[in-house]
Swiss-Prot record:
This is Large ribosomal subunit protein uL30. Signal peptide: none annotated. GO terms for biological process: translation. InterPro entries: Ribo_uL30_ferredoxin-like_sf (IPR036919), Ribosomal_uL30_bac-type (IPR005996), Ribosomal_uL30_ferredoxin-like (IPR016082). The gene is rpmD. Keywords: Ribonucleoprotein, Ribosomal protein.
Amino acid sequence: MTKEAKVKVQLVRSPIGTKESHRATVRGLGLRGVNSVSELQDTPAVRGMINKISYLVKVI
């Protein structure tokens, strides 16, 4: 049985004033308010979402 790779993401900037698609990406990652943390599976789709909003989040 293999372990799934995980990645933790923290929202460090508010998505207010950003594009609607970027706000939707933040919600899609399970992030709500500033400093909220979400632990997700490390997949190419999740990596792409993190890359899209890299100016709003921090990988921890």
